[in-house]
Amino acid sequence: SSDTSIFIKESSSASTEPNELGVFAMTDRGLRGISNPSAIFLSEHRENVPGSVVMVTQEGTRPLLVEVQALVDGSHLPSPKRLSVGLDQQRLSMLIAVLHRHAGIGCYDQDVFVNAVGGVKITEPASDLAVMLAIAGSIGNRAMPAGLVVFGEAGLAGEIRPAPRGQERLKEAAKLGFSKAIIPRANAPKTPIEGLEVFAVDRLTDAIAAARDTA
């Protein structure tokens, strides 16, 4: 059979960078490394689905494209659910508060579920922008533009902060055929990246407007 099971582990080898991410598949011929894990994690990605955003994360030294999904639905509970799979639970509550305060998008009476597709565990704050745009898309029942990737950390004042290795993230997205990127202004490339239109933003409201205007 060609069916595979995906395993993700941090390398402990002295010959690799600290926290290097290794992605492996168990096949009928045994365990093998995957040279292009983004293709695996995006293999089931469907464009133009409300609540779905593709982000470029950087675990170790490898840029990795991952789909982040959000579902926001009316709650019948006194304290609505806030559930995150593959992303930081406490950070989700903070991002919901930032969305409400700085973009006027409230979900105080709604359950919020967020998932990093494919079993990936994302630990870096550069996932913030993807999570917030996914939540906003689910609430507004509005899909993100086709071919869009995002990354960026959110501050409590609604600012979008830069992520490390921004150029590597953008080049990986372009290599995989993505055509638009919403990123922190400080990560804007010095020279254009072929095939990739970059929207550099300072604030959450700018990012939401860019996603809407480029649809």
Question: Language-model segments: which ranges?
Answer:
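Peripheral, non-AAA+ core regions of ATP-driven protein-machinery
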Residues: 1-215
